[in-house]
């Protein structure tokens, strides 16, 4: 314990204690110390704070508990405010202090915390302060210290200085200010989850925690407080100190006077995300906010683009794509992500220009230094050279004026001689001598005179040679050019230095520093410089006379400057009038923690007209003024409220549809304001279709504009955004410039270019103008639907396709591919009618799309089961007249749902707030002819009665209105469900299945109102997902307004309303006698109803409207009433609400009802915040939409052309056109010696970051060739005679295939297909021997197998590792250590080099196991949005042929798990790393089959097995039986090898959180997870060593299969351990045991003869024997190569099958394959023949070659291989080998003894084997899976009592037709002729083939081709038919059919029509021909006999007259003619 007493070790000491009494005793003080802070935190911070903000608040010093429960619109801001008020400020208040701008209740809490808070001072500055402060203070602060709460941002330093001047005793102000520090450079928040803000002019709009209802506005200049160290006003100095920052909330201290130590300038730093700033682009300015990126992502991407071998253009974007969705990076802008990937892409090839040589001498080091520092040498040498050049030139210049007297060189006098002879005593003369004297120049006597120029100059020239006479003249000076030359020479080095600096290159050190500054910047910090400022004094109070301090008496006159009032106040008649208001009032202080009221409640500024100011001085305020409160006038009416800025006035969606709403009396819209201010426009603002009249197609021209002035616009032609003009020009031939000129001449500039023309392009609004000018009509085809715009009478028609951002001209018959299955859903006519419907008030229905709803049978089954059992609904109410029949109907419906398939219907959902008017437009829609066949379902009878009153139906139609139970028994085409969220869960699906006639469903409801709750405790309906979540995909818009609720309720709920009622909310102590009482509990409502009151429950009143006041009774149940039902209660009445009962239930306390309290106490709250979890994520509309406008926009591809064209073919794996950097070339050599590596250039962008893609560091091992493993001398086996065909004919007994199948949900499985299957060996197909698993042909395979193969968790909560799992896992680990002779306490150090090789091996396996095209097609497996714990389950396709499955029945399939690529790539190396150590430590007596061939297994058996009785074992549901103990066991294994903790935690997380498409799975083994085979094998080994004392007993293990050579003794502990395991053993004891499908024994291994015999039979019958013969022969040779001894390990019953297999191979195998049956080695001649074309070989084969073949192999070119060359790596590749043993695939080879195996692997690739070994591709049908089977996964059982099933026959092929090509030129000709007039006098029957019609024959005579586009028969009544209706039976058929008289309705499409009478007199009936069923070509190069034929029968009418026609029939249509024949047409 001494080590635990040192600091820092206490925590580890406590954690090391086991859960014993010692630990409990030691940790007792911890619990005691936590109790009080936890309780205090819960009391002080009770709000529910999201977990992502916990760490932020902890860093701010806020001690939150994390267990908060109370809801708050912005809890983090509230917590910071509370911390500042209750934890920080009380410590600053060391004396009496005043507090400003805080609510009285908060001040009371603050005062109770710190008594020094003496006074509260509040000023009402704006109207909303009336709700905050009950009164306005009339005095100024009177204490030395003042605390100003969240108001400093509204005051300037000059105003604060004025407060100090007004209060002389005031010394310091503690103030809190809410302002984002990043607003200094951006308008985008760095903490968007915490707050957002935006700029509006000089103001900043602050929005806390994503709650737009709580935003408020403050001046942007508030940021100056964070940038000020102090300020001076006049001669007074004030210091500003930043005490602390809590995110956007800052605490400041403002003091009077200069402190002794004061810094005028400093820097303030603020907390920001961990980010770096990207360098700005060259020569461009880019906002810093869009260059901030996360530092971790930047570092990872930097390394990624330099580590990948081949970098493609899309790789950085793919890497960034994996990070964009992470919530911690929500602060990063999309532009920053774009800049990051672009920066990484552009700079990927940049590397640091540094070197690290190893110097071998100082000279090398010096020379390298000189080469590196050339710039420094330049800088040092240039000044020296410049000085030297100047000195040299100057010296030479001084020599020029000297006169040379004597010059002697080499002893000879060159100039001058000695004047006296050389005497003997003279010394020798020097060999070099230069004697000079200064030259002279003429004196200056007379400037420029002839005397001076001629005489004196000549005299001086003559005297210069004489040293004596030259002294008489002045000394000559050097010429001036000498000085200039010296300066020029001195400037040369400096100029060279300047050029070197300008042209570069820079010094290596500078380049190095620039590289690191660019690519490795320092972390970005937000620093604001602070400095001293100077301000002018401003008035603190702008309300006329300033309040006075409490301690000062009111003076006689105010000497303070008078400022204009800040806000209007009530005038006092006793005072002088105040000066008029000169400015708009500044915003009032708004605390960050208190949400300001919604914008609707803010009144606009009211102009106050004040009388003229009197010159006299204003008198002193009277005592009445000091005691009065400043008040404001009444609030404006609700109609003047502003709308919520977050609620769009146009409900625009991403689908291209815009709902336009009728403008109300609101402020001008921005577009209107822009139009009004546009100088190029004139006239009023109106829609274009009103301005320019025309026959417009709705909704063409529905945009606002004004008339243009006479001058055309000067906006230039949008060259890069004119794709719409190009498309119109191509269609019409008009030049694009002409089209643009037309737009410029007709549209104002603000409409022509709204600011986005250059980037987003033209819109369909511009096309409307072109259509009006040039008479155009166009069909726009987009992925969201087709829309036709233009004029009805247009002269030009064409079609334009719109893709996002682009228009292009297409053919008129162009159409996008329809959604799969959408065209088969009926009700398309209803959908179109619903879209075209316009209500009487000119509004349209608020929905965007008609959705296709696919029913969920499980939900319907759940509800009908609960109804059947009496848990939900009242069956007696369904049909009160016959309750028994209703119950029978429900029971029948319950039975039908057991086998029902999902249905698809069309559906719209109108969702909106209570009273928004959802029912009223639907009631008018149901009156239209298309929707008259409807039925309405409502939750209550009250709502049913209201619907009847609304629609006033006829008596025969009242049945259409009913409750939800009775509606199930009715039938109609249209189903309307009102208050759908009040219905039971699953009602929508049940109602659709109950009525097969339903084609269209209309849902009405409000998701935030009450939902259905079953009253029976046994009901399972609540287990279904709620309706608001189930129906959310169908909510297109939410109608956020109300026509019902009064204004007071709307104000409280923050909801717009159109009601003019002011409303009221009051309390009454008595019940009303006539009003409706709403009660929470059903029992209370029943009691009041029994007493005669009209009382209903709140839940049952949902959907109802109360004209008078609603009486809400309060009781104890009201406190527990949900918010949804509380909202129902307060939104029923149109006039007001009266509360009765217990008033304490609405007193506003925490235990009271929140909504009732808010209404009664008039407290405002936000519905959008309160119900944010229930409201749909869709656009909100605040007014009824009035039209369906379509706005398409396109700019062409000039702005941003995509990398690939839209119609370009998909990229292939060999595409490298986007590779910009290729570093895959080897550094040294040609790469032939490197480890095999696959290029990753083809991988999806989101998968490449998961690959390290690094070359292997494994050195080349110089292995010696292995010695040849020659086989022993074996005796040739002798086989008893057995005919394969004879045995096969009797092998399969007579079998009823259907008796082996099973039924799942009424559908029979298909594991034994036998129909149309070929067979030749027996009486039936051999496929009946064993079940065939193929989900493509058996849709029940996977659903029926789920119950056996998968185990589900009860909820989405993770699986919890239980104590039992920990114990059992540790026991398994200890047993596994015993098996490998390890100590459980040993820990292997982590080897990073080996792990890197495992990563390479895993990546190589993943890249080579599938084709590159397959990997590219599976790009979604690396989708970052795919949760790693989400797994897709699918069935494994295989033919289960082994001894256990032969002659068996239905068998569950094996399930495979498809996991995210990241899981496989991260955890795969872990398993390979473990496998390396397992192979190293595995004892010789333990055999694991992975990585071994059957021949190696046979060798091991011969070496270790004995003739003893063996114990073989298998398990039932082995994967499903491994629970939490397996996870603990695997965790122990990874910890033993020191695997990084992150990988261990990831493995545990995935195992405990896995979920599938069928539901969440419990902890179990999944086939497909990394290391499935290894973990199964280890688990099996551990279990066997737990049960037995294995010791040295030989043990063979492979997955769940195992074999012991003999049964060891059982361990004593097994009896206690066995009950803890969930395993089911299948042990077999005997001398003949099988392992992995082989009989094994002391003589080797033999493939199980019955199983091999069955495989041969199946292959012969299905014709695939040619593909599988070599594989089966290889399996056979495993035992055959052992010689005659293998018979000792085969049971006697297997002998015939072994002989039959030998007989088959001898008679059917080709000669070259029979070589495999020979024992011993192959002859050398055969090897020579095989090695001729050999390019590579294994070591064993290489050892068998002769010298010539070895040289040939060594010098041959190496081909790429698909497997590693190292045998150890190949061995590590053998994962999941056991599963592959049973996988039946087309095989081409097998295993055989080494070296024969290698030899015949080469032979199989030889062309000498012939074409019989070619493998034909297998065509696979698409897989069909049910949607979800988790709940009914066990419905697999015996055959049902009834043998009814559906035999789905294939459809008949279409009849052959002559292919008609589309003509390039054609004419569409309309035609019409009258059939006859019908008088009714006699019956009529007529028919006609249109191809032989005289009218059409004449019309089509000049043409060779004629095609009917449309044809119909139209019947029109005549006036006499009013009293004599006449009936027609009409049908269209192919010409080959001729219906008899009156039999027209016996044919499909036949119709019976009645015309005339009082109803049908004014209608014309048309019967169109369905040309899809008939041949429309009535004339072609060949004749057809299936052209359209019409047949009509008309019975006689009583009283018919031959002269009085009753009706007339016409045939009319359109025929397309083409290919003129050229024949002459006779003239008329």
Swiss-Prot record:
<keyword id="KW-0645">Protease</keyword>
<dbReference type="InterPro" id="IPR043629">
    <property type="entry name" value="Salyut_dom"/>
</dbReference>
<dbReference type="GO" id="GO:0019028">
    <property type="term" value="C:viral capsid"/>
</dbReference>
<keyword id="KW-0511">Multifunctional enzyme</keyword>
<keyword id="KW-0696">RNA-directed RNA polymerase</keyword>
<keyword id="KW-0547">Nucleotide-binding</keyword>
<feature type="active site" description="For protease activity">
    <location>
        <position position="806"/>
    </location>
</feature>
<dbReference type="InterPro" id="IPR007094">
    <property type="entry name" value="RNA-dir_pol_PSvirus"/>
</dbReference>
<keyword id="KW-0067">ATP-binding</keyword>
<dbReference type="GO" id="GO:0005524">
    <property type="term" value="F:ATP binding"/>
</dbReference>
<feature type="site" description="Cleavage; by viral protease">
    <location>
        <begin position="1790"/>
        <end position="1791"/>
    </location>
</feature>
<dbReference type="InterPro" id="IPR008043">
    <property type="entry name" value="Peptidase_C21"/>
</dbReference>
<feature type="region of interest" description="Disordered">
    <location>
        <begin position="661"/>
        <end position="682"/>
    </location>
</feature>
<keyword id="KW-0548">Nucleotidyltransferase</keyword>
<keyword id="KW-0693">Viral RNA replication</keyword>
<keyword id="KW-1130">Modulation of host ubiquitin pathway by virus</keyword>
<keyword id="KW-0808">Transferase</keyword>
<keyword id="KW-0945">Host-virus interaction</keyword>
<keyword id="KW-0946">Virion</keyword>
<dbReference type="InterPro" id="IPR043502">
    <property type="entry name" value="DNA/RNA_pol_sf"/>
</dbReference>
<dbReference type="Pfam" id="PF00983">
    <property type="entry name" value="Tymo_coat"/>
</dbReference>
<dbReference type="GO" id="GO:0008174">
    <property type="term" value="F:mRNA methyltransferase activity"/>
</dbReference>
<feature type="domain" description="Alphavirus-like MT">
    <location>
        <begin position="65"/>
        <end position="226"/>
    </location>
</feature>
<keyword id="KW-0489">Methyltransferase</keyword>
<feature type="domain" description="RdRp catalytic">
    <location>
        <begin position="1508"/>
        <end position="1614"/>
    </location>
</feature>
<dbReference type="InterPro" id="IPR027417">
    <property type="entry name" value="P-loop_NTPase"/>
</dbReference>
<dbReference type="InterPro" id="IPR027351">
    <property type="entry name" value="(+)RNA_virus_helicase_core_dom"/>
</dbReference>
<dbReference type="GO" id="GO:0006508">
    <property type="term" value="P:proteolysis"/>
</dbReference>
<keyword id="KW-0378">Hydrolase</keyword>
<dbReference type="GO" id="GO:0039648">
    <property type="term" value="P:symbiont-mediated perturbation of host ubiquitin-like protein modification"/>
</dbReference>
<dbReference type="GO" id="GO:0006351">
    <property type="term" value="P:DNA-templated transcription"/>
</dbReference>
<keyword id="KW-1127">Modulation of host ubiquitin pathway by viral deubiquitinase</keyword>
<feature type="domain" description="(+)RNA virus helicase C-terminal">
    <location>
        <begin position="1040"/>
        <end position="1172"/>
    </location>
</feature>
<feature type="region of interest" description="Disordered">
    <location>
        <begin position="544"/>
        <end position="603"/>
    </location>
</feature>
<feature type="site" description="Cleavage; by viral protease">
    <location>
        <begin position="822"/>
        <end position="823"/>
    </location>
</feature>
<dbReference type="Pfam" id="PF01660">
    <property type="entry name" value="Vmethyltransf"/>
</dbReference>
<dbReference type="GO" id="GO:0003723">
    <property type="term" value="F:RNA binding"/>
</dbReference>
<dbReference type="Pfam" id="PF01443">
    <property type="entry name" value="Viral_helicase1"/>
</dbReference>
<dbReference type="GO" id="GO:0004197">
    <property type="term" value="F:cysteine-type endopeptidase activity"/>
</dbReference>
<dbReference type="Pfam" id="PF19227">
    <property type="entry name" value="Salyut"/>
</dbReference>
<dbReference type="GO" id="GO:0005198">
    <property type="term" value="F:structural molecule activity"/>
</dbReference>
<feature type="domain" description="Peptidase C21">
    <location>
        <begin position="669"/>
        <end position="824"/>
    </location>
</feature>
């Amino acid at each position: 314990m001494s080590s635990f007493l040192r600091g820092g070790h206490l925590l580890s000491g406590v954690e090391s204690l086991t859960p014993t009494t010692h630990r409990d005793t030691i940790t007792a003080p911890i619990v005691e110390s936590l109790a009080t802070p936890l309780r205090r935190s819960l009391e002080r911070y009770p709000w529910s704070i999201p977990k992502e903000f916990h760490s932020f608040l902890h860093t701010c010093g806020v001690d939150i508990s994390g267990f908060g429960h109370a809801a708050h619109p912005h809890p983090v801001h509230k917590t910071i405010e509370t911390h500042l008020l209750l934890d920080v400020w009380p410590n600053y208040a060391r004396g009496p202090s005043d507090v400003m701008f805080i609510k009285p209740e908060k001040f009371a809490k603050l005062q109770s915390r710190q008594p020094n808070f003496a006074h509260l001072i509040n000023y009402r500055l704006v109207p909303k302060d009336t709700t905050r402060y009950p009164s306005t203070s009339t005095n100024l602060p009177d204490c030395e210290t003042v605390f100003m709460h969240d108001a400093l941002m509204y005051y300037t330093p000059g105003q604060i200085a004025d407060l100090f001047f007004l209060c002389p005793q005031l010394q310091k102000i503690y103030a809190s200010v809410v302002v984002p520090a990043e607003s200094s450079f951006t308008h985008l928040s760095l903490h968007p989850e915490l707050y957002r803000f935006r700029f509006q002019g000089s103001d900043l709009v602050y929005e806390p925690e994503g709650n737009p209802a709580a935003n408020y506005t403050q001046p942007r200049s508030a940021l100056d407080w964070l940038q000020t160290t102090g300020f001076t006003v006049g001669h007074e100095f004030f210091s500003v100190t930043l005490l602390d920052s809590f995110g956007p909330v800052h605490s400041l201290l403002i003091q009077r006077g200069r402190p002794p130590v004061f810094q005028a300038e400093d820097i303030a730093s603020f907390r920001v995300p961990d980010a770096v700033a990207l360098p700005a682009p060259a020569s461009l300015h880019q906002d810093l906010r869009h260059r901030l990126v996360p530092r971790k992502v930047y570092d990872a991407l930097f390394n990624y683009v330099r580590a990948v071998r081949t970098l493609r253009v899309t790789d950085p974007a793919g890497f960034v794509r994996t990070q964009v969705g992470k919530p911690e990076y929500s602060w990063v802008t999309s532009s920053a992500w774009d800049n990051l990937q672009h920066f990484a892409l552009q700079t990927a090839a940049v590397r640091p220009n540094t070197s690290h040589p190893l110097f071998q001498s100082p000279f090398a080091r010096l020379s390298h230094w000189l080469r590196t520092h050339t710039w420094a040498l330049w800088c040092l040498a240039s000044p020296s050279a410049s000085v030297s050049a100047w000195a040299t030139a100057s010296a030479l210049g001084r020599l020029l004026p000297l006169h040379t007297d004597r010059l002697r060189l080499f002893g000879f006098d060159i100039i001058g001689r000695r004047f006296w002879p050389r005497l003997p005593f003279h010394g020798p003369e020097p060999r070099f001598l230069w004697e000079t004297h200064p030259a002279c120049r003429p004196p200056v006597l007379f400037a420029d005179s002839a005397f001076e120029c001629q005489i004196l100059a000549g005299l001086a020239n003559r005297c210069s040679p004489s040293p004596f006479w030259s002294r008489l003249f002045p000394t000559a000076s050097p010429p001036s050019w000498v000085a200039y030359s010296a300066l020029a020479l001195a400037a040369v080095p400096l100029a060279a230095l300047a050029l070197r600096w300008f042209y570069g290159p820079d010094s290596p050190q500078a380049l190095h520093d620039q590289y690191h500054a660019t690519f490795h910047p320092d972390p970005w910090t937000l620093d604001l410089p602070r400095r001293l400022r100077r301000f002018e004094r401003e008035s603190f109070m702008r309300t006329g006379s300033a309040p006075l301090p409490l301690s000062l008496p009111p003076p006689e006159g105010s000497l303070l400057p008078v400022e204009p009032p800040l806000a209007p106040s009530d005038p006092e008649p006793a005072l002088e009038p105040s000066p008029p208001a000169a400015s708009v009032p500044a915003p009032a202080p708004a605390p960050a923690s208190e949400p300001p009221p919604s914008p609707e409640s803010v009144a606009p500024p009211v102009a106050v007209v004040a009388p003229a100011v009197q010159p006299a001085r204003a008198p002193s305020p009277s005592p009445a003024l000091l005691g009065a409160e400043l008040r404001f006038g009444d609030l404006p009416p609700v109609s003047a409220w502003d709308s919520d800025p977050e609620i769009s006035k146009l409900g625009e969606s991403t689908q291209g549809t815009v709902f336009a709403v009728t403008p109300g009396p609101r402020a001008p819209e921005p577009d209107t304001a822009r139009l009004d201010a546009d100088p190029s426009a004139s006239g009023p603002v109106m829609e274009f279709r009103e301005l320019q009249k025309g026959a417009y197609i709705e909704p063409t021209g529905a945009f606002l504009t004004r008339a243009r002035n006479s001058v055309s616009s000067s906006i230039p032609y949008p060259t890069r955004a004119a794709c719409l003009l190009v498309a119109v020009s191509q269609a019409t031939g008009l030049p694009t410039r002409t089209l643009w000129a037309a737009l410029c001449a007709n549209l104002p500039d603000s409409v022509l270019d709204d600011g986005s023309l250059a980037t987003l392009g033209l819109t369909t609004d511009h096309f409307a103008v072109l259509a009006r000018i040039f008479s155009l009509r166009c069909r726009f085809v987009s992925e969201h639907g087709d829309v036709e715009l233009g004029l009805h009478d247009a002269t030009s028609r064409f079609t334009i396709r719109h893709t996002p951002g682009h228009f292009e001209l297409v053919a008129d018959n162009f159409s996008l591919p329809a959604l799969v299955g959408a065209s088969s859903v009926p009700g398309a006519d209803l959908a179109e009618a619903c879209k075209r419907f316009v209500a009487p008030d000119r509004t349209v229905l608020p929905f965007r799309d008609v959705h296709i709803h696919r029913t969920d049978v499980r939900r319907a089954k759940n509800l009908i089961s609960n109804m059947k059992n009496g848990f939900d609904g009242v069956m007696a109410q369904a049909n009160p007249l016959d309750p028994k029949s209703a119950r029978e109907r429900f029971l029948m419906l319950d039975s039908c749902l057991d086998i029902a398939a999902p249905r698809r219907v069309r559906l719209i959902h109108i969702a909106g707030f209570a009273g928004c008017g959802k029912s009223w437009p639907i009631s008018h829609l149901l009156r239209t002819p298309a929707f008259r066949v409807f039925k309405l379902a409502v939750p209550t009878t009250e709502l049913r009665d209201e619907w009847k009153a609304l629609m006033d139906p006829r008596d025969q139609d009242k049945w259409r209105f009913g409750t939800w139970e009775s509606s199930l028994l009715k039938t109609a085409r249209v189903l309307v469900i009102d208050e759908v969220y009040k219905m039971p869960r699953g009602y929508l699906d049940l109602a659709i299945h109950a009525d097969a006639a339903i084609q269209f469903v209309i849902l009405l409801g409000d998701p935030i109102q009450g939902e259905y709750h079953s009253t029976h405790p046994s009901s399972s309906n609540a287990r279904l997902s709620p309706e608001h979540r189930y129906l959310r995909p169908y909510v297109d818009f939410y109608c956020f307004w109300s026509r019902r609720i009064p204004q007071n309720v709307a104000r409280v709920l923050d909801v717009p309303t159109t009601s003019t009622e002011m409303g009221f909310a009051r309390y009454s102590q008595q019940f009303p006698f006539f009003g409706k009482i709403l009660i929470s509990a059903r029992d209370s409502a029943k009691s009041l109803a029994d007493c005669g009151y009209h009382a209903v429950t709140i839940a049952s009143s949902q959907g109802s409207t109360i004209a008078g006041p609603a009486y809400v009774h309060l009781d104890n149940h009201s406190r527990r009433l949900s918010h949804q039902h509380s909202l129902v209660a307060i939104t029923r009445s149109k006039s007001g609400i009266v509360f009765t009962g217990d008033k304490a239930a609405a007193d506003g306390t925490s235990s009271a009802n929140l909504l009732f309290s808010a209404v009664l106490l008039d407290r405002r709250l936000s519905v959008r915040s309160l119900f944010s979890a229930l409201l749909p994520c869709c656009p909100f509309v605040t007014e009824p939409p009035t039209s369906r406008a379509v706005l398409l926009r396109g700019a062409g591809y000039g702005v941003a052309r995509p990398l690939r064209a839209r119609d370009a073919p998909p990229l292939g794996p060999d595409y490298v056109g986007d590779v910009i950097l290729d570093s895959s070339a080897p550094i040294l050599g040609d790469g032939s010696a490197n480890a095999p590596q696959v290029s990753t250039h083809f991988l999806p962008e989101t998968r490449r970051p998961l690959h390290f893609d690094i070359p292997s560091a494994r050195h080349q091992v110089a292995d010696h060739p292995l010695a040849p493993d020659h086989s022993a001398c074996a005796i040739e086996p002798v086989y008893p005679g057995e005919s394969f065909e004879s045995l096969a004919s009797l092998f399969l007994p007579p079998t009823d295939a259907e008796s082996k199948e099973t039924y799942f949900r009424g559908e029979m499985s298909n594991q034994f297909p036998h129909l149309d299957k070929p067979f030749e060996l027996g009486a039936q197909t051999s496929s009946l021997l064993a079940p065939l698993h193929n989900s493509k042909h058996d849709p029940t395979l996977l659903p029926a197998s789920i119950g056996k193969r998968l185990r589900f968790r009860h909820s989405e909560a993770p699986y919890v590792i239980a104590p039992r799992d920990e114990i059992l896992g540790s026991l398994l680990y200890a047993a596994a250590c015993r098996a490998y002779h390890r100590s459980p306490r040993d820990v292997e150090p982590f080897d990073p080099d080996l792990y890197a090789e495992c990563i390479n091996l895993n990546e190589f396996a993943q890249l080579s196991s599938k084709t590159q095209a397959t990997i590219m097609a599976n790009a979604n497996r690396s989708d970052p949005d795919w949760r790693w714990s989400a797994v897709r389950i699918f069935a494994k396709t295989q033919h289960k042929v082994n001894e256990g499955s032969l002659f068996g029945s239905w068998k569950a399939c094996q399930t495979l798990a498809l996991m995210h690529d990241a899981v496989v790539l991260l955890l795969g190396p872990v398993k390979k790393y473990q496998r390396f150590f397992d192979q190293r430590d595995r004892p010789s007596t333990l055999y694991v089959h992975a990585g071994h061939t059957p021949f190696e297994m046979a060798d091991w058996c011969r070496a270790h097995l004995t003739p003893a009785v063996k114990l073989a074992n298998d398990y039932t549901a082995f994967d499903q039986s491994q629970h939490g103990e397996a996870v603990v066991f695997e965790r122990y294994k990874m910890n033993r090898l020191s695997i990084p903790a992150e990988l261990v935690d990831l493995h545990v997380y995935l195992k405990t959180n896995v979920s599938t498409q069928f539901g969440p799975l419990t902890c179990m083994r999944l086939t497909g997870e990394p290391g499935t085979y290894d973990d199964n094998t280890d688990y099996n080994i551990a279990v066997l060593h737990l049960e037995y004392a294995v010791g040295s007993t030989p043990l063979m293990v492979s997955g769940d299969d195992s074999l012991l050579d003999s049964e060891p003794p059982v361990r004593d502990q097994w009896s206690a351990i066995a009950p803890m395991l969930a395993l089911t053993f299948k042990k077999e004891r005997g001398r003949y045991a099988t392992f992995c499908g082989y009989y094994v024994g002391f003589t080797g291994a033999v493939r199980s003869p019955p199983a091999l015999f069955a495989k041969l039979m199946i292959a012969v019958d299905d014709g695939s024997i040619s593909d599988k013969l070599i594989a089966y022969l290889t399996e056979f040779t495993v035992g055959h190569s052992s010689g005659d001894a293998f018979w000792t390990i085969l049971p006697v019953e297997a002998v015939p099958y072994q002989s039959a297999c030998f007989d088959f191979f001898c008679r059917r195998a080709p000669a070259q394959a029979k070589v495999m049956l020979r024992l011993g080695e192959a002859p050398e001649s055969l090897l020579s023949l095989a090695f001729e074309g050999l390019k590579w070989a294994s070591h064993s084969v290489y050892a068998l070659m002769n010298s010539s073949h070895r040289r040939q192999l060594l010098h041959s070119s190496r081909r790429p291989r698909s497997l590693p060359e190292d045998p150890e790596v190949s061995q590590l590749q053998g994962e999941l080998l056991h599963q592959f043993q049973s996988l039946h695939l087309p095989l081409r080879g097998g295993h055989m003894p080494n070296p024969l195996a290698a030899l015949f692997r080469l032979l199989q690739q030889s062309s000498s084997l012939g074409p019989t070994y070619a493998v034909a591709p297998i065509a696979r049908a698409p897989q069909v899976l049910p949607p979800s089977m988790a709940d009914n996964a066990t419905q697999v059982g015996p055959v049902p009592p009834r043998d009814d099933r559906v035999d789905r026959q294939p459809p008949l092929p279409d009849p052959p037709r002559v292919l008609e090509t589309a003509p390039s030129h054609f004419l569409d000709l309309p035609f019409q002729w009258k059939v006859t007039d019908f008088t009714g006098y006699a019956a009529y029957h007529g028919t006609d083939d249109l191809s032989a019609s005289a009218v059409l024959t004449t019309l089509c005579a000049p043409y060779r081709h004629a095609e009917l586009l449309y044809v119909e028969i139209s019947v029109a009544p005549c006036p006499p038919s009013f009293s004599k209706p006449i009936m027609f039976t009409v049908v269209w058929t192919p010409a080959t059919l001729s219906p008899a008289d009156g039999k027209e309705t016996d044919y499909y499409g036949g119709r019976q029509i009645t015309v005339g009478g009082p109803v049908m007199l004014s209608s014309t009936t048309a019967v169109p021909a369905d040309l899809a069923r008939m041949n429309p070509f009535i004339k072609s190069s060949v004749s057809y006999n299936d052209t359209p034929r019409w047949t009509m029968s008309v019975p006689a009418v009583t009283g018919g007259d031959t002269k009085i026609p009753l009706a007339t029939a016409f045939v009319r249509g359109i025929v397309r003619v083409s290919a003129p024949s050229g024949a002459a047409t006779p003239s008329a």
